[in-house]
Amino acid sequence: MKKFSRILVVLAVLSMAMGLMTGCGNKKSEKSDNQSSVEQIKKNGKIKVGVFSDKPPFGYVDKNGKNQGYDVVLAHRLAKDLLGDENKVEFVLVEAASRVEFLQSNKVDVILANFTVTDERKEVVDYALPYMKVSLGVVSPNGKVITDVKQLKGKKLIVNKGTTAETYFTQKYPDIELLKYDQNTEAFNALKDGRGAALAHDNTLVYAWARENKGFTTGIKSLGEHDFIAPAVKKGND
């Protein structure tokens, strides 16, 4: 776990620094936008980073009200890189469905909330280099483990709004009834309460959750495309 965390830190800091400071294009206007964005962050004296409040081990708020997780570590490193002080970061709590809106409305400078790169999202945000590769996973109760999507016929599948899981099952399996929730906590509680037969999310998340919650198994370990997770900034601020 510690080795994985260190790898994520190095890769993410490099990708975010490249994304925020060098840009992806060659146009003068893009370079000007990049400089303006970084200069504004420096002028503000802090960087506002969107993170999850309930998605361990990536982003969560602990019992003392403190932000924790890989994404939080990455945010501190980014603040150190840009501003010379890892504490010059303001954490803004986001839900999956609000990540784009928070960027577009300047509520955050960067999204570090397990944001999967998709063609649709590329039209409205700019991504830095990816730092993690994921696919979808499906977790379900022991004794009623879902190992094939066909087993979900006539059953309810729990997903989070605004996630790749919601998009995937809506497009590929429109006959499967989806129970949609805003917060990860709500979704996983729904699974515990038996409101759905299974829950679909990024496989990295469901693996971690199943390890911490006895009585549940990730029966479908990889589903759909292998996608990438990357930091995102407002369109034009790449």
Region spans (language model):
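Extracytoplasmic small-molecule ligand-binding "clamshell" domains
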Residues: 31-111
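Short loop->beta-strand "edge-of-pocket" segments that line small-molecule binding or catalytic clefts
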Residues: 47-51, 68, 149-163
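Extended ligand-binding regions for polar small-molecule ligands
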Residues: 25-31, 72-73, 77-81, 161-163, ...
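C-terminal motif of bacterial Sec signal peptides marking the signal peptidase cleavage site
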Residues: 19-23
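Acidic, polar ligand-binding/catalytic clefts
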Residues: 76, 88-151, 218
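Alpha-to-beta junction loops
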Residues: 47-48, 85-87, 94, 104-113, ...
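Periplasmic-binding protein-like
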Residues: 53, 132-140, 203, 207-238
